[in-house]
Amino acid sequence: MIKKYDYLLVGAGLFSATFAYRATQAGKKCLVIDKRPHLGGNVYCENIEGINVHKYGAHIFHTSNKQVWEFVNSIVEFNRYTNSPVANYKGKLYNLPFNMNTFYQMWGVTTPEEALAKIEEQKAEAVAALRGREPRNLEEQALVLVGKDIFETLIKEYTEKQWGRKCVELPAFIIKRLPVRLVFDNNYFNDKYQGIPVGGYNKLIDGLLDGVECKTNVDFFQSEYRDGWREMADTLVYTGALDEYFGYQLGKLDWRTVSFKTHVEDKPNYQGNAVVNYTSHDVPYTRVIEHKHFEMFGQEVYDCPKTVISEEFSTEFKEGMEPYYPVNDERNNQLAEQYRRLAEKEENVIFGGRLGQYKYFDMAPIIEQVLQMNIG
């Protein structure tokens, strides 16, 4: 029986959009459905006051993979935005990631030698306090890696806001390493390439899905597709939540989520940077995003008379919220593994993306994954 589609893709995020693009290039017919009223998943931008607002949080594309970079640039041109966040701790500003600028701001040190001596001295105090045992929690682990001042100013309260738990209650493995740069360099990423699509991420998604049949406001689980997809398509590409696909039969996986308060400010420049992290408990949000700085530089910032900011709050996931980050503790890792084993047994179903694989991915690795797949 000839079916109408080669692929039915559930979810219109980066995994599905890249997959549909490659399948269409190979002459296959695709249908993409998404329960949201828009395409693009979490990279979707909303235009407010002429500014592309990252509706689901800051998305900064970065990779060292030349093939991935050339692929996305073949769809849309990327600008040269460089991520250089600033941390605000009780009104004092520090450059991120931890580098010579940060150490000068914290201690007044001006040479790598002085900075290293200060860090090593504080690390030694933390190691001595453990009396020969391994760190038992995130707090002990971070103190051993960077020492007291950096931990208490830039890590402790920020991490507690992000996770909704105290650092002494979080497992040590969350922080494997904390890179310390003994150079004056505020570029957050070590990757060779980074930037934002010129005109916003919708341009990237629209380019990937050009000529592909797409339907929004369609919930896979509340539609004819849930039980009838095999009559319509040869293969299902599923990028929704892994546990939801199986009706939560083994139990629910936990997620962290974020929420945003977005508002227009009647001034051209609110904070002078795209990303400012608030690393103390006295401010309820974890960071403030000023969206225009992703795409407007120099005089362009002032040519646009208003600006849009989003305060980002990290919260416990509840029914009806958008799942963002997998909770990679022992219980959830084991449960996810059980679901993955079920997924492997599903015939003609590909599970993809952050939700479908219960793994945190940056954007570039998702695209890299799809580029490596045999789609035909």
Predicted regions mapped to residue ranges:
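A short alpha-helix-loop-beta-strand transition element characteristic
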Residues: 68-90, 150-153
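N-terminal glycine-rich dinucleotide-binding loop that anchors FAD/FMN and/or NAD(P) in oxidoreductases
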Residues: 46-71
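C-terminal segments that line or cap access tunnels to active or ligand-binding sites in enzymes
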Residues: 234-235, 244-375
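Glycine-rich FAD pyrophosphate-binding loop
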Residues: 24-49
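Short hydrophobic core segments
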Residues: 8-10, 33, 230-243
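Short, solvent-exposed loop/turn segments at secondary-structure junctions
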Residues: 13-16, 37-39, 101, 160, ...
